């Protein structure tokens, strides 16, 4: 070997040793970033390693790492919004291995007369998780961040993602109301910033959740156990919508999006002109005793036209800042959503009476009078604005003013083909309808809610705290000129051959209706809390009360116009809607029915409440909160009913004592066991007490009639929950609940006064409702799974009729008692989501599945003929990508599986696969009475935040 070659090899070996040494001296820098005060992980904190200039972001569990860093001393610089910057020095050696644990402090602004600590961002997932963990009651929370990256844009649709919650959908397929733990929507209460708000619904107390744009919220809290300081009229739960609050520094957020419904890929959107619609009825414009001319009912809003709708529009803007040396905080947030939704619907109209069963061992079969084939086209404008001003006088006294205005305008065109089932005539082999009515209905449904709340917080002494609220709220609904035009044709079977002929169309009666109502609340709240010690343990005694005065006014006036006969006194032949001629028969029909319409009423309600409670901690493990609340209810109303009819007016008074006890045992700082007992009530809806009939929306098939003999409902509630809050966003909860319900209110079919069938509320004895809840969320790096499952079992003793043929040949009516679940309760509901969340790529995505088990929609008068909503599986998708620090692009897809809404009767379908089979039937195991399809919808858009 030559010396030159030996030298090369030695030099190569030297460099290999040097490189290997450098590699061996390299190590990873790992660590976690936490909040100094709460010990929560900080997600998305910016970490810079100098002098290398390497950058990274903390992950979902607050962790970060820099790979293969050579031995030496480095400086870490950590920044996070709302926190003071942190700098620390780290030395890398061969043995470096233990992760760093870094704590950041929230920024503190020093004022001349007041110290204001930077408030936590209530819109984050971390805040929601921490609040669930530290709350005094059992609660589930969804943050604004989770809402933004979910497939949903309204509060109602977000609700279906929460444990124990299912939703009821409207004609457009969007959610409207929440059912919590199997308790129908009537048993739940909606709050804005902890304050109860009135409902624009013309019959009920519950608030339509689709009126709330999700962009206005910081978070949604579903409170499942009540403390004494909370109002007691909630059995299922309380939905607290926490609006955005004034920030600690300037913020600007905006959203612009668009979308489309797949329904209108296949058909046109039907619209109608609104310029000629009068907001008030002729009787309101001219006076109650003035006969309205036919010209007061222009035809323009009945002439529907079809075309492809424009894309949907979704806009929002939020601005906030602090002024006057940070004493004054201001935020203004607004949202506007314009969408075109709809559905294709098929309905079998059920007859008021059903034929008898062949004997006592067989079931009765349902009977149907009509088949409705409908197309709904709805233009929905949803807008909202909320503002808050808060002023800190000093460290002991502050005041705030919240104002919220919400509006939901829905203009719906409903095209109906109504086939009259007159029966079957087998001799001529004809099976089908005996008349066809083509109907056009146009409806404007205008709802609004405003709320103004003035609140103050005062630290009277070091131990004594006070807070108070003065509240004014109003909810309105206007449904001006619900117009329906109908054309009828006779169907005449031909002899023996099974064919038929259809007569030329004739003009039928025209209906025009005006509905409007207002619900006004004036409320005052006051609370005192005194901090003390008992037996060496910390305690807080609380006392307070509230008063609410509610006034509800309801107006309803219906006009029926009769077509003018031709010169031969025959039916008027249909040419066109503008060419159709009408008159009033009898002549006083021109007054409408307002004079005797019980839908015109004035309702007063006064509620006084007081409570006392004690929060007591035993060491660091036990926490108790218990006390007693009393609520005194005074109601009176006066309607336009005849004085000879029960329910024209009433005075109703009752008092309730509502005890409550919440307990919590903490195994450590992440694991706890909660338990609670509380008593709650449900006050009947206003219109449920007044016996007038009305169709509440364009989708209603049956009249709803009130019952003046209803009693209010009382409920005893028990809860138990075990919870684990893991690292990052991981969590696990499992719990059980039980409710004993005295005098539950359910809607049942009953014959009306006109030979038809109507829905009527009634008390149904006692009921038991119990169940289990499971919640989980777990991330594996950037991927995760989340979900919840709720099992609910309820039992109510119901009374039904059973009509059958006796062995003697006669018929008999028996009153039978049978057990069934509560109306609206699904035995099983579940959510499951596949998640992707990367702080490095700034991509969030989720594929979300919701399962809702079958549930009773309407209770039948007859045994075994209840209407059930068939179980559903809904699949949605959303994803977003953040660009830089300020811009986000998102996409959302809803109802990917095109899941229909179906009502069924769980009786054997005797006519299935037979000559007399009814339309849109799917199985011999049940009878389908309604089948609605909505199709998928798509949204894309941009958000920015400064």
Where are these regions (language model features)?
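Extracytoplasmic beta-strand/coil segments of soluble accessory domains associated
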Residues: 156-196, 219, 237-238
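A beta-strand signature from Gram-negative outer-membrane beta-barrel systems
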Residues: 100-102, 211-255
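Gram-negative outer-membrane beta-barrel transporters
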Residues: 737-740, 760-856
């Amino acid at each position: 070997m030559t010396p030159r070659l030996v030298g090369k090899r030695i030099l190569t070996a030297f460099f290999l040793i040097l490189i290997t040494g450098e590699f061996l001296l390299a190590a990873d820098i790992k660590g976690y970033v936490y909040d100094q005060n709460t010990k929560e992980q900080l997600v998305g904190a910016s970490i810079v390693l100098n002098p290398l200039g390497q950058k990274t972001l903390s992950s979902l569990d607050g962790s970060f790492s820099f790979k293969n860093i050579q031995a030496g001393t480095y400086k870490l610089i950590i920044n996070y919004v709302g926190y003071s910057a942190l700098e620390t020095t780290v030395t890398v050696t061969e043995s470096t291995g233990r992760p760093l644990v870094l704590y950041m402090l929230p920024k503190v602004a020093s004022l001349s007369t007041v110290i204001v600590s930077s408030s936590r961002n209530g819109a984050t997932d971390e805040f929601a998780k921490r609040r669930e963990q530290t709350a005094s009651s059992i609660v589930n929370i969804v943050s604004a961040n989770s809402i933004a990256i979910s497939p949903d844009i309204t509060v109602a649709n977000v609700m279906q993602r929460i444990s124990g919650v299912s939703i009821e959908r409207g004609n457009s397929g969007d959610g409207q109301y929440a059912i919590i733990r199997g308790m129908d929507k009537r048993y739940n209460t909606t709050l804005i910033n902890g304050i109860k708000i009135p409902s624009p619904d013309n019959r009920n107390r519950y608030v339509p959740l689709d009126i709330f744009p999700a962009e206005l919220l910081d978070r949604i809290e579903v409170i499942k156990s009540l403390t004494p300081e909370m109002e007691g009229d909630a059995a299922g739960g309380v939905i607290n919508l926490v609006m955005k609050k004034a920030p600690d520094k300037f913020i600007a957020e905006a959203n612009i999006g668009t979308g489309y419904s797949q329904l209108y890929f296949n058909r046109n959107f039907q619209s109608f002109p609104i310029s000629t619609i009068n907001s008030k009825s002729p009787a309101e414009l001219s006076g109650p005793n003035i006969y309205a001319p036919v010209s007061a009912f222009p035809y323009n809003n009945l002439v529907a036209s079809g075309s492809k709708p424009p894309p949907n529009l979704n806009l929002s803007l939020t601005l906030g800042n602090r002024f006057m040396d940070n004493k004054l905080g201001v935020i203004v947030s607004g949202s506007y959503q314009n969408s075109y939704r709809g559905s294709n619907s098929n309905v079998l109209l059920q007859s008021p009476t059903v034929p008898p069963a062949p004997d006592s061992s067989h079931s009765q079969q349902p009977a149907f009078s009509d088949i409705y084939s409908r197309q709904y086209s709805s233009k929905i404008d949803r807008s909202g604005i909320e503002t808050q001003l808060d002023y800190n006088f000093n460290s002991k006294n502050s005041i705030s003013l919240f104002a919220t205005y919400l509006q939901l305008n829905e203009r719906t065109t409903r095209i109906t083909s109504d086939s009259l089932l007159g029966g079957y005539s087998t001799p001529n082999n004809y099976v089908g309808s005996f008349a066809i009515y083509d109907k056009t209905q146009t409806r404007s449904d205008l709802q609004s809610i405003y709320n103004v709340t003035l609140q103050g917080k005062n630290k009277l002494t070091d131990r004594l705290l006070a807070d108070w609220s003065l509240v004014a709220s109003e909810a309105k609904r206007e449904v001006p000129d619900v117009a329906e035009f109908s054309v009828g044709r006779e169907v005449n079977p031909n002899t023996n051959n099974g064919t038929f002929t259809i007569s030329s169309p004739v003009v039928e009666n025209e209906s025009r209706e005006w509905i409007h109502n207002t619900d006004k609340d004036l409320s005052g709240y006051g609370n005192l809390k005194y901090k003390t010690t008992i037996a060496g343990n910390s305690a807080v005694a609380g006392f307070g009360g509230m008063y609410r005065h509610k006034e509800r006014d309801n107006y309803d006036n219906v006009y029926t116009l009769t077509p003018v006969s031709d010169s031969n006194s025959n039916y008027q032949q249909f040419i066109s809607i503008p060419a159709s001629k009408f008159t009033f028969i009898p002549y006083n029909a021109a007054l409408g029915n307002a004079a005797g319409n019980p839908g015109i009423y004035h309702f007063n309600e006064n509620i006084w409440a007081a409570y006392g409670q004690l929060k007591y901690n035993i060491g660091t493990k036990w926490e108790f909160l218990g006390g007693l609340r009393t609520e005194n209810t005074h109601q009176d109303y006066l309607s336009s009913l005849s004085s000879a009819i029960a329910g024209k007016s009433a005075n109703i008074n009752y008092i309730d004592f509502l005890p409550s006890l919440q307990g919590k045992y903490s195994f450590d700082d992440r694991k706890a066991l909660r338990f609670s007992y509380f008593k709650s009530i449900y006050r009947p809806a206003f219109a449920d007490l007044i016996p007038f009939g009305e169709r509440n929306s364009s989708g209603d098939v049956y009249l709803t009639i009130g019952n003046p003999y209803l009693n209010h409902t009382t409920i005893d509630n028990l809860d138990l929950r075990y919870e684990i809050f893991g690292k990052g966003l991981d969590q696990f909860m499992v719990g059980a609940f039980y409710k004993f319900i005295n005098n539950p209110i359910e809607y049942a079919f009953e014959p009306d006064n006109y030979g038809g069938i109507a829905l009527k509320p009634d008390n149904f004895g006692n009921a038991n409702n119990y169940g289990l809840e499971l919640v989980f969320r777990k991330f594996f790096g950037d991927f995760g799974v989340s979900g919840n499952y709720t099992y609910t079992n309820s039992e109510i003793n119901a009374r039904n009729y059973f009509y059958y043929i006796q062995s003697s040949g006669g018929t008999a009516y028996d009153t039978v008692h049978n057990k069934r679940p509560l109306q609206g309760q699904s035995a099983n509901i579940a959510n499951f989501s596949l998640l992707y969340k990367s702080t490095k790529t700034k991509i969030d995505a989720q594929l979300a599945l919701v399962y809702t088990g079958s549930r009773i929609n309407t209770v039948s008068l007859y045994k075994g003929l209840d209407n059930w909503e068939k179980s559903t599986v809904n699949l949605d998708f959303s994803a977003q990508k953040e660009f830089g620090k300020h811009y986000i692009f998102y996409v959302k897809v809803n109802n990917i599986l095109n899941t229909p809404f179906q009502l069924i009767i769980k009786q054997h379908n005797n006519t299935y696969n037979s000559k007399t089979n009814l339309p849109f039937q799917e199985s011999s195991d049940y009878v389908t009475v309604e089948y609605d399809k909505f199709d998928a919808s798509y949204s894309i858009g941009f958000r920015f935040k400064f």
